[in-house]
Amino acid sequence: MRGLLVAIAAFVCFGTAPSHAQPASQFKVTILIPATPVTGVPDKVFVLLTTDCPPGVGTGRHTHPGDEYGTMMEGSVLTRQEGGEWKTVNAGQSYYVPANIIHETKNVGTVATKAVNAFVLEKDKPRFTPVQ
């Protein structure tokens, strides 16, 4: 799991593997807490990470095998969940994406964004799955 980038997603997303359809030099993921067992829930892991996203870069449509919780620390992004409207998430605001929901985020601003994302994921599944 540690080898896949996410995104925050969201941005999410949320290291050491391919990014969300963007060159790794553009979208940076820093793992703060790698996949760690959740006490009393043997099939789940917790992951904490930050994402840095320059202007004009997005995550593309994707899913996660678990819930995503995030807070935008710097900048703002547009985000939407499958079937929903685009929404703006600004610095200081938090967001939630349920497990397996197709979603995407893009930085349409003029400054880089930074987000902190926490995930409770299914153990042994990729953290980020692109969707066409």
How would you name each of these model-derived features?
Residues 42-45, 56-71:
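A short beta-loop-beta micro-motif enriched in histidine and acidic residues
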Residues 59-64, 81, 88, 106-108:
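Short histidine-centered beta-strand/loop micro-motifs
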Residues 64-83, 93:
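Glycine- and acidic-residue-biased ligand/ion/polar-headgroup-sensing regions
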